[in-house]
Amino acid sequence: MKHGGVTKFSIQNLLGPIVILILLTHFVGGASTSLQLITQFALCLFVMVLALQVFVGNSGVLSFGHGAFALIGSYTSAILTAPVNIKDNALAMNQLWEPLVSPQVNVYVSLVISAVVSGLVAGITGSLLMRLNGLAAGIATFALLGVAYNVFFNNKEIGPGSQALPGVPWITNTWILLLLAV
């Protein structure tokens, strides 16, 4: 709600979607394995849509940067959680940069590290790109997304390139994903 040009926080606007998510997670996510997987993907998409809405809705500037930052975070998490023997022996990973081969952490530690890495990249690029507005901002952030895509999918020194990275563990608990989404 807006009062005099200032957005007023309403707890009902926040708790409504959270209660719906909790109920959907409880009833749909626990029904079967396939519905649990669909619920987990829906929670991931919910976070992406919410990230887009928070920025575009508040600033009015179209931005594709959140896709690039999610890409950076997911690749960071995948490289950190993949088993060392898979990174050593996988066909696409034989050119992997040496400091990326040896580290292996659990999923939750990798989420924190990947959030920090993508946050740093967002801070650096955001300080440059947020001086733009209108169509220029949309084009520049779309270019950032294109650069991130091409770097990660064509450079085999920092990841598997266009091939899949096997052995990355899943978070199988839908309640943990709900907590991360909220």
Give names to the regions the model predicted:
Residues M1-V182:
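Transmembrane alpha-helices and adjacent helix-loop boundaries
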